[in-house]
Amino acid sequence: MSEKTIVVLPGDHVGTEITNEAIKVLKAIEEVRPNVKFNFQHHLIGGAAIDATGVPLPDEALEAAKKADAVLLGAVGGPKWGTGAVRPEQGLLKIRKELNLYANLRPCNFASESLLELSPIKAEFAKGTDFTVVRELVGGIYFGERKEDDGSGVASDTETYSVPEVQRITRMAAFMALQHNPPLPIWSLDKANVLASSRLWRKTVTETIEKEFPQLTVQHQLIDSAAMILIKSPTTLNGIVITSNMFGDIISDEASVIPGSLGLLPSASLASLPDTNKAFGLYEPCHGSAPDLPANKVNPIATILSAAMMLKLSLDLFEEGVALEKAVKEVLDAGVRTGDLRGSNSTKEVGDAAVEAAKRILKN
């Protein structure tokens, strides 16, 4: 038996509820698979960490994460901590940088076709949407040179990218494309008509694909045009979508409304290619901490699907990850849903249903 260590960072507000449901489903796998054992280690991050320690990411949490097989994160932030000098989101940025989590993967698809009616896009246009945004996560404007307003009325942020950074994220996108037969097309989003960093981005993506992955195709699209296409004809972008940190942040949030709720979409942030299904990664839902949501009302599906990604990409438990995805589809098809999906079930009820479905699938 090989024990997998998972550092759990619940974070703020609904973070504890959603990570609890994901853990519950993972423990169900332990029950069915005697050779699988998880070691869950809980630590603080975000506003909860600020309240307890004065910093958004305590050293002990970071050190535990460095030694783990994977990290499961809930959500951070909330109006309580405002936009002061010490903010919850700083903990998230720090852990990404310290763990070198350079690639953020955000799938956009329908976990169940029964959800098509909930999409703000007409079903005939939304049906079949299936792409993954591969976002560069530790470079660009979020980590560039920054100048706060010192009273002069001027502030600035600097966007910087290097060839090695762009090559690295391009190789991740290529790897993901090659997991399919035939390989998926790659879309690269930038603002090369205006930004020097985007011109370097486009040139490097093109050269890397041509030299290292000649069997793949890449199409370049300006980010503003891509944002329009995403609403007008989302299936046009089916495949792998690669882009920079800020553009990826924006376009993936826009994409997240297509399936009908932020509560459905998982994400993975990886430190290496998952070529042996053992890449170190941090897994979290795409939604925020939802401070105004009453207890037991948050949708846990995105976090459960994040756990499924963790099983497949970091813990070398691919079959179990697929089983979780099938379980989620069964739950949604059965109409067990929280309020964001026009359902009446609680967080716990959805989690319980996922547990029972996963057990049944794994036993067959």
From Swiss-Prot:
NAD(+) binds at residues 78-89, 288-299. Pfam families: Iso_dh. The lineage of its organism: Eukaryota, Fungi, Dikarya, Ascomycota, Saccharomycotina. InterPro entries: IsoCit/isopropylmalate_DH_CS, IsoPropMal-DH-like_dom, Isopropylmalate_DH. One of its GO terms (cellular component) is cytosol. Its EC number is 1.1.1.85. This is 3-isopropylmalate dehydrogenase. Mg(2+) binds at D224, D249, D253. The gene is LEU2. It comes from the Eukaryota. PANTHER family: 3-ISOPROPYLMALATE DEHYDROGENASE (PTHR42979:SF1). It comes from Wickerhamomyces anomalus (strain ATCC 8168 / CBS 5759 / DSM 6766 / JCM 3585 / IAM 12210 / NCYC 432 / NBRC 10213 / NRRL Y-366 / AJ 5027) (Yeast). GO terms for biological process: L-leucine biosynthetic process.
